[in-house]
Amino acid sequence: MKGNLNKMKKKALNKLIKLLDLEALEENLYRGQSENIGGSRVFGGQVLGQALTAALRTVDKKRSAHSLHAYFLRPGDMGYPIIYDVERTRDGRSFTTRRVVAIQKGEPIFDMVVSFHKKEKGPSHQIDMEDIPGPEECVSELELKKQIAHKVPEKFRDFFTRERPIEIRNLPGEGMFEGPKKKPP
């Protein structure tokens, strides 16, 4: 059973990698396809992921995204490919900025600005992480979904409980849709 789950997870991951692998049309211009997830509209996370992939293809590999702002302007249509137009806004010594516009049928459907930064030493400001159980002690999102699948309309159950390329595990006591209420530190 576990080997079969690993095969399903690997298949889902390969499908995601293929979806994010854009076709280069010319410099700064890419085309992406869409995955049908049960409707006529494109999933927004797919558009964001493909836009980030397009931006990454124009940036030095030593830099990683550290800030991203995105706007969903119009719904994407499953029946058409998406064109990603990358504007090389700035290439500095430490920071790189890109703007990506996703286009369908000649209209922008999505606009994103992303900043990349090379790894540098500097001050770190963060709150110490709580002492929490490790992933192996937490229930997977898929297991939780299977427990409540009977509450989902039958026509959506297979989609709801399908294997995903990225595994999510909730902390004990946290539900899928809401966690425990905590006061900020």
Please provide the spans of the model-predicted regions.
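Terminal targeting signals and extreme-terminal segments of soluble enzymes
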Residues: 2-185
